[in-house]
């Protein structure tokens, strides 16, 4: 009898837990994805803050030359970062218990992998949680689909790229100057500026910013006048009011006259679909570009494409970029390589005699 009561109480407790987790009445929706998301993101944030403040230098290149990244080891907010894992570890899974000691784990950059793994799982679950809440409220799933763009971009730089390059040491450092270093080295090794998918991503991000500013300014300017022409149009409104304050027909008429008629949307759903799709598709393409360049399918190479009638090279901007790439490649990991990879890979000429 006692066992039966205990089982009932246990089942009742589990039922109440399930109800709490899936309730849309909570101030913050948790959801089943949230059960995984919350501990993962808390772990990633905690380890990141501790490592950014106090982690010892990391042997990122695997050549016994540690690089300092934390505030307590001489960095500031701009120069500091969580340094990627050592090249000596490669792609091995490297939790704390795989190291001989905590000092070894820190020296080889273990915190980086810990942050990245928990962060990627956390943001993936955040995306799932967006879908889950939409489902429970009877909404369509496009919020989660839109969020998949930054999730894909983060996965590309933190996971796909290191896998393609053979080492987590090639992942993006977790800091401001580290991000810039990653971008410069990426350009040097993969010529990303000449990759069409990156160009589409730039169009998506900059275009999305432009369209967002245009839409917001147009909506806030197209007021339905509630006052006479002798008063300010703003006098008929209070901040944060629930009633609609703008007239899409007026906005359509204004914009159609500013550019031309068919450059303007007269359908609110079409307009907002466009505003969502433009940046999302652009960032999807960038993530795909990073993922292909991870396996060295690089940007276009138009070096020395133009020659005169005597066969002499006439430099184009492609040649200028190539020269900059070689300079950047020479400078990075300068003690790990005797030559840039582009120069070292060329077969040496035969010597007669």
Swiss-Prot record:
Describe the processing and modification events after translation: Tyr-161 forms a radical intermediate that is referred to as redox-active TyrZ, YZ or Y-Z.
Q: Where does the source fall among the domains of life? A: Eukaryota
The positions annotated for binding chlorophyll a ChlzD1 are 118
The residues the record assigns to binding [CaMn4O5] cluster are: 170, 189, 332-333, 342, 344
- UniProt GO cellular component terms: chloroplast thylakoid membrane; photosystem II
Binding sites annotated in the UniProt record for a quinone: 215, 264-265
| Positions annotated to bind Fe cation | 215, 272
Its annotated compartments are: Plastid, Chloroplast thylakoid membrane
Give the positions of the site Cleavage: 344-345
Marked site positions, Tyrosine radical intermediate: 161
Where on the chain is N-acetylthreonine found, per UniProt? 2
The Gene Ontology biological process terms listed for this entry are: photosynthetic electron transport in photosystem II; response to herbicide
Q: Which key words are in the record?
A: Acetylation, Calcium, Chlorophyll, Chloroplast, Chromophore, Electron transport, Herbicide resistance, Iron, Magnesium, Manganese, Membrane, Metal-binding, Oxidoreductase, Phosphoprotein, Photosynthesis, Photosystem II, Plastid, Thylakoid, Transmembrane, Transmembrane helix, Transport
Site, as annotated: Stabilizes free radical intermediate: 190
Task: Please write the reaction equations for the catalytic activity of this protein.
Answer: 2 a plastoquinone + 4 hnu + 2 H2O = 2 a plastoquinol + O2
State one molecular function term (GO).
chlorophyll binding
Q: How does it sit in the membrane?
A: Multi-pass membrane protein
Q: What is its EC number?
A: 1.10.3.9
The residues that cross the membrane are 29-46, 118-133, 142-156, 197-218, 274-288
Query: Which amino acid positions bind pheophytin a, per UniProt?
Result: 126
The residues the record assigns to binding chlorophyll a PD1 are 198
Other remarks?
Answer: 2 of the reaction center chlorophylls (ChlD1 and ChlD2) are entirely coordinated by water.
**Function as written in the Swiss-Prot or TrEMBL entry:** Photosystem II (PSII) is a light-driven water:plastoquinone oxidoreductase that uses light energy to abstract electrons from H(2)O, generating O(2) and a proton gradient subsequently used for ATP formation. It consists of a core antenna complex that captures photons, and an electron transfer chain that converts photonic excitation into a charge separation. The D1/D2 (PsbA/PsbD) reaction center heterodimer binds P680, the primary electron donor of PSII as well as several subsequent electron acceptors.
Please state what the protein is called: Photosystem II protein D1
